Amino acid sequence: MGGSSRRQRSTSATRRDDKRRRRQCFSSVADDEEETTSIYGVSSIFIWILATSSLILVISSPSSNTSIQSSSYDRITTKHLLDNISPTFKMYTDSNNRNFDEVNHQHQQEQDFNGQSKYDYPQFNRPMGLRWRDDQRMMEYFMSNGPVETVPVMPILTEHPPASPFGRGPSTERPTTSSRYEYSSPSLEDIDLIDVLWRSDIAGEKGTRQVAPADQYECDLQTLTEKSTVAPLTAEENARYEDLSKGFYNGFFESFNNNQYQQKHQQQQREQIKTPTLEHPTQKAELEDDLFDEDLAQLFEDVSREEGQLNQLFDNKQQHPVINNVSLSEGIVYNQANLTEMQEMRDSCNQVSISTIPTTSTAQPETLFNVTDSQTVEQWLPTEVVPNDVFPTSNYAYIGMQNDSLQAVVSNGQIDYDHSYQSTGQTPLSPLIIGSSGRQQQTQTSPGSVTVTATATQSLFDPYHSQRHSFSDCTTDSSSTCSRLSSESPRYTSESSTGTHESRFYGKLAPSSGSRYQRSSSPRSSQSSIKIARVVPLASGQRKRGRQSKDEQLASDNELPVSAFQISEMSLSELQQVLKNESLSEYQRQLIRKIRRRGKNKVAARTCRQRRTDRHDKMSHYI
């Protein structure tokens, strides 16, 4: 009984304890439910906002007073966010936090090891989802991090200077040549620097050698100097040349720019010269190199003396003594050595009379060149040289011209006229004269009493025959006239080149072989390659007997440089070359065009007749 009663009491006590525990547990659970319900209500709101709108909560920057509250608030918010989201996102967040802590720990170790971080921005430990940018704090961090390294900036042409709150102000460390940097436009030196840099960039792109700025400076000066020798420089190039030359030759003209220094230096040198003794012999040697007024006076005095040192350089002072203050006519001494045909003629600048000139002149004209040595004079003296020895296939004939009038021949400036006439008092020749050597000579006398002689077999050679081709009329003063003859003509031969003078076809229908006008191989050939012939007009102005055309007579009457046959047969380029001659008058040019047109018409008519004859012959052949 006793055991059972004790067992019942323990059972009832156990039941009472269980009831008591149940009541305590129920009260605690109720309290917990109230607390969790309120918290679960707040967390559900955050979860709904994050899930529906995917917004990132941006909270303003916390102040220094509320730093503790913000940190506790961050912890509470993070706890509830991580407790009420999915397990996958919670695992992802935990892994990110662990990785972020590992990275911060590793970065802290590297910073402790290196002494300074390689990053210039601070590392903020903030959870995901809450971010803000504190510009003021970051700017303070950058400014307090230490001296900022200067970055070399190339000059750039800008309209206005950059205006930025983070920009640095003007400093003397900038790589520029401007002294005052508050100006928006660059200086001239900046522009020159930009030009040099541009040239270097272009040279680098092209793969050529990059020239240094100093070399470019001298190269520009050298280029302008070379250009000034060829063509005149422009105003801009002249200004640039002066600027470059001033900079290049600044050291050379430095002592001459300072007049006071120069005067003082000369005064010191003169004082040293006046002193009887010198301390150093080297100073005496240096002073002897400089010439002063006294030395120049001694030099001029030595020049004026006959037995001076400079006069000993002249070997022929006895033959040609020095004459001072003389005119040109008094100073020129004419003798056989320096006398030429051009000096022999009377000129407006020469007051020497022709009568004072020695008359010992040969039949052959002297040389026109200024060579008066004995070897050259003997070379041009009359010798038994025929043209075939020099030109084997030539048809040249020497034509000597003599002045038979009493008036003196005056030079008109033409070489082919000056050297051809000689002032000799020979009598006029008859129309047909037999020379002393038995050679036939035939002459033709013009109205101006100038005799033209053509020789059959030449014993003299005229070296100036190729220079006698002139497009200008041979005119002189009123005292004499000019009439010339060329032995070579495109259709007419010289009367002395054949023995059948009585033939009516002579000089008209029987031209000599090789005397026709030969067209030049190149249309750009010079005027000297064209053989110029001229028909000699008769004294009465009448046409010759035979089939001489009207155009040939017009060409000879108007002194055209070429014949009518040449005008009609020459190429267009050669015709333009003849028309460009400045010595031709407008009437002569019109006459040349007229003869050309009629010559072409004659050729066309001849071709037409030939075609008609050929067609008639073919028809008769078939019939």
UniProtKB/Swiss-Prot annotation:
Record GO terms (molecular function): DNA-binding transcription factor activity; DNA-binding transcription factor activity, RNA polymerase II-specific; Hsp70 protein binding; RNA polymerase II cis-regulatory region sequence-specific DNA binding; RNA polymerase II transcription regulatory region sequence-specific DNA binding; sequence-specific DNA binding
Q: Which GO terms describe its biological process?
A: ATF6-mediated unfolded protein response; cell fate specification; cellular detoxification; defense response to bacterium; defense response to Gram-negative bacterium; determination of adult lifespan; digestive tract development; embryonic digestive tract development
Coiled coil (residue ranges): none
Domain of life, per lineage = Eukaryota
Report, from the record, the phenotype seen after gene disruption. RNAi-mediated knockdown of all isoforms results in a severe reduction in transcription of gst-4, gst-5, gst-7 and gcs-1 mRNAs during infection by P.aeruginosa or P.faecalis. Susceptibility to P.aeruginosa and P.faecalis is characterized by a decrease in survival rate.
Phosphoserine modification sites are 164, 430
Region span, Disordered? 1-29, 158-184, 421-451, 467-557
Which PROSITE patterns did the record assign?
A: BZIP_BASIC
Q: Where is this region: Basic motif?
A: 540-623
Note the SS bond partners: none
Q: In which tissues is it expressed?
A: Postembryonic intestinal cells.
Q: Which residues fall in a compositionally biased region of kind Low complexity? A: 435-449, 472-498, 511-529
Tell me where it resides: Nucleus; Cytoplasm
Naming one, the record's GO cellular component terms include: endoplasmic reticulum
Keyword terms: Activator, Cytoplasm, Developmental protein, DNA-binding, Mitochondrion, Nucleus, Phosphoprotein, Stress response, Transcription, Transcription regulation, Translation regulation
Q: Spans of biased composition, class Polar residues?
A: 173-184
Family membership, please give it: Belongs to the bZIP family. Skn1 subfamily.
- What quaternary structure, including any partners, is listed in this protein's UniProt entry? Monomer. Interacts with GATA factor elt-3; interaction may enhance transcriptional activation of target genes.
The protein's matches in PANTHER family, at most eight in alphabetical order, are given as: NUCLEAR FACTOR ERYTHROID 2-RELATED FACTOR, SEGMENTATION PROTEIN CAP'N'COLLAR
In the record's own words, the domains note is:
Alternative DNA-binding strategy due to lack of a leucine zipper dimerization segment: DNA binding domain binds to its cognate half-site, an N-terminal arm recognizes adjacent 5' AT-rich sequences in the minor groove and the intervening residues stabilize interactions of these two subdomains with DNA.
Q: What does this protein do?
A: Transcription factor. Required to specify the fate of ventral blastomeres in the early embryo, and postembryonically for the development of the intestine. Directly regulates expression of zygotically expressed med-1 and med-2 to direct mesendoderm development. In response to oxidative stress and anoxia, required to up-regulate expression of stl-1 mRNA. Involved in regulating innate immunity, acting downstream of the pmk-1 p38/MAPK pathway and probably also downstream of nipi-3.
How is this protein named in the record?
Protein skinhead-1
